[in-house]
């Protein structure tokens, strides 16, 4: 089994759903490196009795801290249960996190069913590395 670096994020109204999903997959998740934003990380530690690398709370910059880890290829999977029914004070940060995950072709799940697919994929147990898009032309463009 290859140890994955998994980022887990949930908006306040979605934390209960994420924790229920984590309980369902706790035997698998506890063997991986887990990262989370503030209070989500605390709830995960309590649920799994494992150490979680915790960032700041999302509104205090935690989403952006995870985004930096994605750019630096320090995260393998992002599981983000975001609240589709309520605007967040840090919506620009949420959008930035999701955008940067797509920019770097990171597997992302935004709900329990998609997260189930990620964890049960045959690629999950492999040394899978998503293709990194080639941005050299963009980096070298003349403005």
Swiss-Prot record:
EC number in record: 4.2.3.3
Report domain MGS-like positions.
Answer: 1-143
SMART domains membership: MGS (SM00851)
Q: Known PROSITE patterns for this protein? A: METHYLGLYOXAL_SYNTH, MGS
Please give the GO cellular component terms listed in this UniProt entry. Answer: cytosol
Q: Which domain of life is it from?
A: Bacteria
Keywords from UniProt, A to Z, are:
Lyase
What is the reaction catalyzed? dihydroxyacetone phosphate = methylglyoxal + phosphate
Which top class of enzyme applies to this chain?
Answer: lyase
Q: Name one Pfam family in it.
A: MGS
Biological-process GO terms, alphabetical: methylglyoxal biosynthetic process
Q: Which positions are catalytic residues? A: 63 (proton donor/acceptor)
- What InterPro entries would the database entry show? Methylgl_synth (IPR004363), Methylglyoxal_synth_AS (IPR018148), MGS-like_dom (IPR011607), MGS-like_dom_sf (IPR036914)
Binding positions for substrate per the UniProt entry: 11, 15, 37-40, 57-58, 90
Q: Name one GO molecular function term.
A: methylglyoxal synthase activity
Q: Does the keyword S-adenosyl-L-methionine apply?
A: no
NCBIfam families attached to this UniProt entry: MGSA (TIGR00160), PRK05234.1 (NF003559)
Family designation: Belongs to the methylglyoxal synthase family.
Q: What does this protein do?
A: Catalyzes the formation of methylglyoxal from dihydroxyacetone phosphate.
What's the name of the protein?
Methylglyoxal synthase
Instruction: Tell me which species this is from.
Output: Coxiella burnetii (strain RSA 331 / Henzerling II)
